[in-house]
């Protein structure tokens, strides 16, 4: 790999080794980096970083595309069932790849249950929907999930229960799910950045879950004085997640906490944590709320192309169902 990176201007074997050590394993990683990120590596100046990035972008053919090309690129998007036909319908067929989907809600609203269910559904070929003209079949073979748990709510026994409810082996699901417990925002961001290492190691990561997105940031950055720092850090984290979704055609799911909205007289009386940073970075945004018994309501309130809509689903022993 070092020999390939030496094709970039100003990159000798020593610099190539430093780039690889810093996680920049290929041209695409360098092409999508910022000058500031590359200058963090010892021995790389701003001028050298700018040259590397521009050359890598040329090699990756990054630039303007026509609307027709983008429409064709959209054919490579695949979808994963949530387990609820009604919720899948709201999403026009299921959760989209190449996007970040947020599920926000109060405790007990079903956020973590949906995350567990998607890990199971990823191992069921009938739950994956793709246009085979745009998606190579091999791309969806042996898919794996990454679950970054920030609240200690991942339960392998619940995954097994859901898998058995779906008629598949729970051990298979667990074998194909990487779990990392993040105790602070630095760990959370590091785990997200390390996902590329798993992919480079031969793991076909197709689902990335952050449960929950903002809890560590919220605990560490308290008070208005630290709000700007929190939002900047959260913005970098969201950029990493969006890049993963785009470059590797995977699904990124995040759960989010909510806060009371005192000035809300109509509609939803809570708002998701994270402000405009999360609002602009998430592709699809849902509010979840409890209903009667085991029923939950999911409201899609932000999407680039789908209308606002609601779906009712149930949380049962077998998992997410209609």
UniProtKB/Swiss-Prot annotation:
BP-aspect Gene Ontology terms: DNA recombination; DNA repair
Cross-referenced Gene3D superfamilies: 5' to 3' exonuclease, C-terminal subdomain, P-loop containing nucleotide triphosphate hydrolases
CDD domains, sorted: archRadA
SUPFAM superfamilies: P-loop containing nucleoside triphosphate hydrolases, Rad51 N-terminal domain-like
Stored InterPro entries: AAA+_ATPase, DNA_recomb/repair_Rad51_C, DNA_recomb/repair_RadA, DNA_recomb/repair_RecA-like, DNA_repair_Rad51/TF_NusA_a-hlx, Hlx-hairpin-Hlx_DNA-bd_motif, P-loop_NTPase, RecA_ATP-bd
Any GO molecular function: ATP binding
PROSITE patterns: RECA_2, RECA_3
Binding site for ATP: 105-112
UniProt keyword annotations, A-Z: ATP-binding, DNA damage, DNA recombination, DNA-binding, Nucleotide-binding
Family membership noted in the UniProt record: Belongs to the eukaryotic RecA-like protein family.
PANTHER family per UniProt: MEIOTIC RECOMBINATION PROTEIN DMC1_LIM15 HOMOLOG (PTHR22942:SF30), RECA/RAD51/RADA DNA STRAND-PAIRING FAMILY MEMBER (PTHR22942)
Protein name per the record: DNA repair and recombination protein RadA
Lineage: Archaea, Methanobacteriati, Methanobacteriota, Methanomada group, Methanococci
């Amino acid at each position: 790999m070092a020999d390939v990176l030496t094709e970039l201007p100003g990159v000798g074997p020593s610099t190539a080794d430093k780039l690889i050590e810093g996680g920049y394993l290929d041209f695409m990683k360098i092409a999508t980096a910022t000058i500031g990120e590359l200058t963090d590596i010892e021995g790389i100046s701003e001028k050298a970083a700018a040259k590397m990035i521009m050359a890598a972008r040329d090699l990756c053919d990054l630039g303007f595309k026509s609307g027709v090309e983008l429409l064709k690129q959209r054919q490579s998007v695949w979808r994963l069932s949530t387990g609820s036909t009604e919720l899948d319908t709201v999403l026009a067929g299921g959760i989209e790849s190449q996007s970040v989907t947020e599920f926000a809600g109060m405790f007990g609203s079903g956020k973590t249950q949906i995350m567990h269910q998607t890990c199971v559904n990823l191992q069921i070929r009938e739950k994956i929907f793709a246009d085979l003209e745009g998606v190579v079949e091999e791309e969806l073979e042996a898919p794996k999930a990454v679950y970054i748990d920030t609240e200690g709510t991942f339960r392998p026994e619940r995954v097994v229960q859901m898998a058995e409810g779906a008629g598949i082996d729970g051990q298979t699901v667990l074998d194909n799910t990487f779990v990392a417990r993040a105790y602070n925002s630095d760990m959370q961001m590091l785990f997200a950045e390390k996902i590329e290492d798993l992919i480079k190691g031969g793991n076909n990561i197709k689902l990335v879950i952050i449960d929950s997105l903002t809890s560590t940031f919220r605990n560490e950055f308290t008070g208005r004085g630290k709000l700007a720092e929190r939002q900047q850090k959260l913005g970098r984290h969201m950029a990493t997640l969006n890049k993963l979704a785009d470059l590797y055609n995977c699904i990124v799911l995040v759960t989010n906490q909510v806060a009371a909205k005192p000035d809300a007289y109509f509609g939803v009386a809570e708002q998701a944590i994270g402000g405009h940073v999360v609002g602009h970075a998430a592709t699809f945004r849902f509010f979840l709320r409890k209903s009667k018994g085991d029923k939950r309501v999911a409201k899609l309130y932000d999407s680039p192309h789908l209308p606002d809509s609601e779906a009712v689903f149930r949380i049962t022993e077998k998992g997410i169902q209609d």
